[in-house]
Structure formats: C-alpha cells, structure tokens
C-alpha cells in the first residue's frame, strides 16, 4: 500500500513527514536510509532525500495531539529535532484549526503556538545540564569540558560546553565563523569521541554580539545541515551559562535565523522560527513500511 508523505523544511533543514494516525509505520534502519538518501541524477538512484524522517503517531497520553518519532538519515531513531518540531507543530495546528498544540516525544512533551504566517514558537522544555544527562562517559563540569582538537599547545578548538536538548550537543566557541570544511572535518571527528557514548551533535558558535550567535552544526547521524533547531537551543544555553549572551538571542545560520530564549522563570528553552512546506508525495512501495 502506498503512503503519502509531506516534504517540509525549517531554514533548509529538511524532513520527510509521515502521518501514521491511520496506518502504522514501523520502518527498519535500512528503510529510513532509503527514504533519506538524496536523489542522484547522474547515477539515477536515491530516495526522496532529507536530513530526518518524522512520523506523527496517534497520541499515547491525555492532553497530547500526537506522539512524534524522529530518525536521522543514518537510520537511527533520535529523541528530538528542533526544526522538525516546528514543522510538526504547524501541521497539527493546521489540521486541528488551533493556535496552539502539545505532543509527546521520547524526550518528553513539547508544545507549540503560532507566531505569524508560517512562523512557529515551540517550548523545547528544560535543557539537560548534568554530565550524565548529556550523557558523557565520565563526570565533568558541562559548562566547559576537558576536550580539545589539534595540538596540545595550540588547539584549534577546546573546552566546549555540553547541553542535552533531548539529544546530546557539544558547543565549541570560536573567534570567527568556521568553514564548512572545518565543520565537517572536526565535527565528524568529535561526533564519535569516546567521551560521548551515544555520539554527539557538534556546534561551532561565534558570538557576534550579546544577542547574536552565528552557528554551524555537524549533526549526529546526518552530517553538516543547513540549520539545527536543537543545536541553536544548545548554543544559546551554553553561551548564557558562560555569560556570553543575554537570555534572548538571534541564532543565525547561513540559511536564516532562529530566535532562542532560555527563559529564566522556569528554565524552559523557547524557539521561534519559520516553517516551509515543499511538496506532497508518495513513498515508494519498498519503503512504505
């Protein structure tokens, strides 16, 4: 049986979104990889192409509109995705003709509300800041952990902050925005460092002003992406913890910007950004699990 999907993106961070309220979806890692593989016109192969696959399941608890699952393009299920969360919130609000919505994920309950035309604000909850919440392989102060890349006496990057936003993040603060090549080389190296038993998303944050961060993120299981919502949240939290930014800041990617607030009253991280609907399609029969 064929299955409909929606192709969406948040600042170019793109998703294949599958509604599973009436038709259950239990894909293998291989099937997720087949969906996420980007088309190659030269070789005449590839799937739909995306950074993550998202399934919107029936709710499992009172007060939620859905239960949402996320997979990285390598086929591994992940706990959270900030840009994907905004896309899901927008879809649920559109279908329910509501201005706000709540839904559950493996990382906990998230909520969203309309902030304008295809602009969504999402409450990402409280960040995990303890070493075993990231998790790290050993106890460390997550404001700045003992990690560096490069020569001991002249490291390229060092002493990053660590934050969990339902998925693990490490954030290096850099004096100037890094190149894609640097982010790929360093990010792929740090992603699988023994300090991170579950792997890690790697951010490179340049503080342009107290209300402005320029960010590039190497995503665990997906590689270098146009934008990363949880990465933006993690960068802002890590920066505030070091006294580098105020509680509200614009986090800028090359593809656009998100507004991130680490709310002092309750410690919740609030993300506001755009949602883009690209197209509707049908999954190939072989991956319509």
Curated annotation (Swiss-Prot):
PROSITE patterns: DAP_EPIMERASE. GO terms for cellular component: cytosol. Its EC number is 5.1.1.7. Substrate binds at residues 13, 52, 72, 82-83, 167, 201, 219-220, 229-230. It catalyses: (2S,6S)-2,6-diaminopimelate = meso-2,6-diaminopimelate. The record marks 169, 219 as: Could be important to modulate the pK values of the two catalytic cysteine residues. The keyword Ribonucleoprotein does not apply. It is found in: Cytoplasm. GO terms for molecular function: diaminopimelate epimerase activity. InterPro entries: DAP_epimerase_AS, DAP_epimerase_DapF. One of its GO terms (biological process) is lysine biosynthetic process via diaminopimelate. Its main location: cytoplasm. Pfam families: DAP_epimerase (PF01678). Pathway: Amino-acid biosynthesis; L-lysine biosynthesis via DAP pathway; DL-2,6-diaminopimelate from LL-2,6-diaminopimelate: step 1/1. Keywords: Amino-acid biosynthesis, Cytoplasm, Isomerase, Lysine biosynthesis. The active site is at 81 (proton donor), 228 (proton acceptor). PANTHER family: DIAMINOPIMELATE EPIMERASE (PTHR31689:SF0), DIAMINOPIMELATE EPIMERASE, CHLOROPLASTIC (PTHR31689). Catalyzes the stereoinversion of LL-2,6-diaminopimelate (L,L-DAP) to meso-diaminopimelate (meso-DAP), a precursor of L-lysine and an essential component of the bacterial peptidoglycan. Belongs to the diaminopimelate epimerase family. Homodimer. This is Diaminopimelate epimerase. It comes from Caulobacter sp. (strain K31). The gene is dapF.
């Amino acid at each position: 049986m064929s299955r409909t999907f929606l192709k969406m993106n948040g600042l170019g961070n793109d998703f294949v979104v599958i509604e599973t309220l009436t038709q259950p979806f239990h894909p293998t890692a291989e099937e997720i990889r087949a969906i996420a593989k980007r088309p190659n016109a030269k070789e005449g192969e590839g799937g739909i192409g995306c950074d993550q696959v998202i399934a919107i399941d029936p709710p499992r608890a009172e007060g939620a509109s859905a239960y949402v699952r996320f997979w990285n393009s390598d086929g591994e299920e992940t706990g959270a995705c900030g840009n994907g969360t905004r896309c899901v919130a927008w879809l649920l609000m559109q279908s329910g003709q509501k201005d706000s919505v709540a839904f559950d994920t493996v990382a906990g309950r998230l909520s969203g509300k309309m902030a304008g035309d295809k602009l969504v604000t999402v409450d990402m909850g409280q960040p995990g800041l303890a070493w075993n919440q990231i998790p790290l392989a050993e106890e460390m102060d997550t404001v700045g952990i003992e990690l560096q890349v490069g020569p001991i006496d002249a490291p390229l990057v060092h002493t990053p902050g660590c934050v969990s936003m339902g998925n693990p993040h490490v954030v290096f603060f850099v004096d100037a925005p890094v190149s894609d090549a640097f982010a790929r080389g360093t990010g792929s190296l740090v992603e699988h460092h023994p300090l991170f038993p579950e792997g890690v998303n790697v951010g490179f944050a340049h503080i342009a002003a107290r209300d402005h961060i320029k960010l590039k993120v190497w995503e665990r299981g997906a590689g270098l992406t146009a934008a990363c919502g949880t990465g933006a949240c993690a960068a802002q939290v890590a920066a505030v913890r070091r006294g580098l930014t105020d509680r509200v800041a614009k986090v800028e990617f090359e593809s656009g910007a998100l507004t991130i607030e680490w709310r002092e009253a309750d410690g919740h991280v609030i993300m506001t950004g755009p949602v883009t609907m690209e197209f509707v399609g049908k999954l190939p029969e072989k991956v319509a699990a």
